[in-house]
From Swiss-Prot:
One CC-aspect GO term: mitochondrion
Task of the protein: Plays an important role in retinal cone photoreceptor survival. May play a role in cone cell viability, slowing down cone degeneration, does not seem to play a role in degenerating rods.
Main localization, broad class: other
Residue ranges constituting the Thioredoxin domain according to the UniProt record: 1-165
DNA damage in keyword set: no
Species assigned in the record: Xenopus laevis (African clawed frog)
Keyword field: Cell projection
Name the UniProt record assigns to this protein: Nucleoredoxin-like protein 1
Length: 215
């Protein structure tokens, strides 16, 4: 998935509009997640109708007010608006966890539009973490099924279930349990003891002591 955004910039839809401008930052936000590419324009009546539904869909899957842990889902908004002001008005009421392609990067926005054959809006492309397409337009699916359709995408994507990890957007080290070192030491001790026991039994066998037989 990172290849799609290689050498590109994505922006967080937060107050400061923080930029993800390194491959590592983008990879950490998108890897092992179902990716939604949302193509829309603020002046479209159909987009205006669908946007609140998509917002609710996304929030119910990622906001811990509704779920114990955020689903492995990311959304990148690709604006087809006529101006940056229109884009900003559209995104103003959308979730802060959304990402978007900078309006000034028109070439990249147009390339995505062509790559996914976007001829009308709204369009919601669903991608596996690998970048392979699950659906070229899941708008109707989201409208009809709501959040349950994410489970289908998740199964098709074969993403790793990280429900056992600490909160999302942490690096691999932060995702490890605090008890990992203890468990590793314990496992090592147990393995050492097993070797000692096996050696002791082998010594008894050699000496005719009839030690325990291992299979």
């Amino acid at each position: 998935m990172a290849d799609l955004f290689l050498d590109k910039i994505l922006v967080k839809n937060n107050r400061d509009q923080d930029e993800l401008d390194t491959e590592r930052e983008i990879w950490e936000r998108l890897e092992n997640r179902v990716i939604l590419l949302f193509f829309a324009k603020s002046r479209s009546s159909q987009c205006q109708e669908f946007a609140p539904l998509l917002k609710d869909f996304f929030v119910r899957l990622t906001d811990e007010f509704y779920v114990d842990r955020s689903s492995q889902l990311a959304l990148v908004y690709v604006s087809l608006d006529q101006s940056e002001e229109e884009q900003e008005r559209f995104l103003k009421d959308m979730p802060k966890r959304w990402l978007f392609v900078p309006f000034k990067d028109e070439e990249f926005r147009r390339n995505l539009e062509a790559q996914f054959s976007v001829s009308r809006v709204p369009v919601l492309v669903v991608l596996k973490p690998s970048g392979h397409v699950i659906s070229f337009n899941a708008v109707d699916e989201v409208v009809r099924l709501g959040p349950p359709c994410f489970k289908n995408w998740q199964e098709v994507s074969e993403i790793i279930d990280r429900s056992f990890l600490l909160p999302e957007f942490t690096d691999d080290r932060a995702g490890r349990s605090m008890t990992d070192p203890i468990r590793r030491i314990k496992y090592k001790d147990e393995t050492t003891n097993e070797k000692k026991k096996r050696k002791h039994c082998d010594d008894e066998d050699e000496g005719g002591g009839g030690g325990t037989e291992f299979f």
